[in-house]
Amino acid sequence: MEMKNAKTAVVTGGGTGVGKAVALALAGAGYQVVVAGRRQAPLDETCAEAQAKYGAGERMLGIATDVSDPAAVEQLFARTVQRFGRVDLLFNNAGRGNPPGSFLDWTPEQWREVVDVNLNGMFYCLQQAFRTMRDQSPRGGRIINNGSISAHAPRPNSSAYTATKHAVMGLTKTAALDGRAYDIAVGQIDIGNAMTELASRMAKGVPQANGEIAVEPLIDADVVG
């Protein structure tokens, strides 16, 4: 059910970590929020928490989505518009980390899995958001891509993740120019290490550029939200 005058946000990777924190913050701010992710159960948990904290149950929708599948992403945005009428904000957040071990031992499939989610998936979501925001009335919206500090400071044995995050920066900069014609603002956040499952190993120590193993500080994911 569309709530009168409420804005609508789509949050990918919305079942855990940074995505969940952002989804809950948006729900608290009065948004209608669609959370997308690979598994339905964590999405349902995010929706339930939004209801418990903010009474936002009718403003929440969880849609299991593989962002590396263009057809699934198209369906995500179609269902969002069907339920809430429009899309005002995309937090383009879904991502995955590197395969384990040295890149010398990675298979082509392991490389592609990272690229398919971190880069291709981000493009598919951005593309569908653009199409939706271009065609709706009033036109326009905002897209925030979740980049990474790895786009600025790579670590050893992180070539898949680091390469995709550098590519995301280029995607963001170009999309920001392309969005002007449609009143679509595109930006990017490059946070440090948030306390999520993906970054949990940072607290145990990870390889540094100088060859040392060092513990890296973590921030609460809620700070991002």
Regions found by a protein language model. Name each.
Residues 15-17:
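Conserved glycine-rich cofactor-binding loop
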Residues 31-45:
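Conserved glycine-rich Rossmann-like NAD(P)H-binding loop of the short-chain dehydrogenase/reductase
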Residues 64-76, 108:
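The beta1-alpha1 cofactor-binding region of Rossmann-like NAD(H)/NADP(H)-dependent oxidoreductases
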Residues 101-103, 110-112:
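Substrate-binding pocket helix/loop in short-chain dehydrogenase/reductase
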Residues 126, 164:
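Active-site helix of classical SDR
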Residues 148:
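Residue(s) in the substrate-gating loop at a strand-loop-helix junction
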Residues 184, 188-189, 204-225:
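C-terminal helical subdomain
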